[in-house]
Amino acid sequence: MILLQNIKRCSLKQLKVLATLLLSLSLPTLEAAENRDSDSIVWHLDYQEALQKSKEAELPLLVIFSGSDWNGPCMKIRKEVLESPEFIKRVQGKFVCVEVEYLKHRPQVENIRQQNLALKSKFKINELPCMILLSHEEREIYRIGSFGNETGSNLGDSLCHIVESDSLLRRAFPMMTSLSLSELQRYYRLAEELSHKEFLKHALELGVRSDDYFFLSEKFRLLVEVGKMDSEECQRIKKRLLNKDPKNEKQTHFTVALIEFQELAKRSRAGVRQDASQVIAPLESYISQFGQQDKDNLWRVEMMIAQFYLDSDQWHHALQHAEVAFEAAPNEVRSHISRSLEYIRHQS
């Protein structure tokens, strides 16, 4: 009131001087507020409120599930990564951030506690910390379930890259049939990074239908991985693949033999009853067909067979194949193989 009375008594010239003075006094405060905004991220506690802001701004949601008052890794990532200037600089203005806390020692508003329990169930959170990226339509883009030695800069860069890649894939999906095979392959690898299952499935179908070498290789590998190596479909894909490289110039026969051997060895370790000769049959077949022309891999294949026999306690067979490997190996690796030979001879 006193200030207003004084202002009323001022002349126009005096008012201009006073306005300048008041503005200059307020500048440091405004500047400090701007600096505070640029030095921190707003972490929303109310998920629905954050989701609404995400929809309005068409920005992705970055949700961190944490127990920051009792869980060591959560404390570490909060202090060293999420609060770091490098992380803030990279994600600020690009995400709507949500913090979902499961506290043990600090008080928490009951409706937020109940909300967080519901979110844990909704997103199937089994470990903390866990970070989920969601689109503004609440579609899950990516999930980080375990953290290693992330820094603020590399995590921030990764999150931005993931969102950008997801956007590229979303735009490419409707026009997938018009993409060249090289473009389709590039997008496929991008979809692998993001575990974009729908894109991967359709791209793989298109590539296999086009009889493309890369996609035939992928299809064969994936069928073997899910235990369908003996299926008619897998055998047809294998035949088409090998026919594309009859002379093994792309090492296709070697790769196929290795994949089949690894699958059979995995079955053996899982307790499937099969003779050792059945497990190594793909490698033996490769040696018989291409061993003489593929000297670079001959010794490697022989050592794989030797190692399998060792694991099966068949020392005599292991020794035979290790000796062949030694003879076929380049001089720089013979010393390593000779130590294995000494060990096998001693044990047998």
From Swiss-Prot:
<keyword id="KW-0732">Signal</keyword>
<keyword id="KW-0574">Periplasm</keyword>
<dbReference type="Pfam" id="PF13899">
    <property type="entry name" value="Thioredoxin_7"/>
</dbReference>
<protein>
    <recommendedName>
        <fullName>Thioredoxin-related protein DsbJ</fullName>
    </recommendedName>
</protein>
<dbReference type="InterPro" id="IPR051099">
    <property type="entry name" value="AGR/TXD"/>
</dbReference>
<feature type="signal peptide">
    <location>
        <begin position="1"/>
        <end position="32"/>
    </location>
</feature>
<dbReference type="InterPro" id="IPR036249">
    <property type="entry name" value="Thioredoxin-like_sf"/>
</dbReference>
<dbReference type="GO" id="GO:0042597">
    <property type="term" value="C:periplasmic space"/>
</dbReference>
